[in-house]
């Protein structure tokens, strides 16, 4: 018999740095989940992605057990790392703050293709390209 789902929680946590402090503690605490158990497992599974914010989708069951799925880091995070910038431009159409080679966009699209709503890799690259433009990044060949 399938376990009954009590709730689904979506969080964005720094890889390898989950602690019982907010936002993790309050989000899991309201379902009575073992917070430390989640933190240890999450930190172990994301240790290789240090420096990124990693989205996670947690499913909590009626018996207070849980499972979680780790997604790929947000495109904006990957683009910031690729362009060596701290944040996007406040005026993306007027002020360009960095350059990203098209090859790097392809690499980012490959990383994110599982989470993107794209039929093929070219469509995924166009999505990443749009994100780069809206951050004030210039795409170079």
Swiss-Prot record:
One or more lysine residues are methylated. The keyword GTP-binding does not apply. InterPro entries: Ribosomal_uL11, Ribosomal_uL11_bac-typ, Ribosomal_uL11_C, Ribosomal_uL11_C_sf, Ribosomal_uL11_CS, Ribosomal_uL11_N, Ribosomal_uL11_N_sf. Keywords: Methylation, Ribonucleoprotein, Ribosomal protein, RNA-binding, rRNA-binding. The keyword Protease does not apply. One of its GO terms (molecular function) is large ribosomal subunit rRNA binding. GO terms for cellular component: cytosolic large ribosomal subunit. GO terms for biological process: translation. Part of the ribosomal stalk of the 50S ribosomal subunit. Interacts with L10 and the large rRNA to form the base of the stalk. L10 forms an elongated spine to which L12 dimers bind in a sequential fashion forming a multimeric L10(L12)X complex. Belongs to the universal ribosomal protein uL11 family. Forms part of the ribosomal stalk which helps the ribosome interact with GTP-bound translation factors. This is Large ribosomal subunit protein uL11. It comes from Syntrophomonas wolfei subsp. wolfei (strain DSM 2245B / Goettingen). The gene is rplK.
């Amino acid at each position: 018999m399938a376990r009954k789902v009590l709730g689904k929680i979506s969080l964005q946590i720094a890889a390898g740095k989950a602690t019982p402090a907010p936002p993790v503690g309050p989000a899991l605490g309201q379902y009575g989940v073992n917070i430390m158990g989640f933190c240890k497992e999450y930190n172990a599974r994301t240790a290789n992605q240090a420096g990124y914010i990693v989205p996670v989708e947690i499913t909590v069951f009626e018996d207070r057990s849980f499972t979680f799925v780790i997604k790929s880091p947000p495109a904006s995070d990957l683009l910031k790392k690729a362009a060596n910038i701290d944040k996007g431009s406040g005026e993306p159409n007027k002020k360009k703050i960095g350059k990203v080679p098209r090859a790097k966009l392809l690499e980012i699209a490959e990383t994110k293709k599982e989470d993107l709503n794209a039929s093929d890799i070219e469509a995924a690259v166009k999505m990443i390209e749009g994100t780069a433009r809206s951050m004030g990044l210039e795409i170079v060949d």
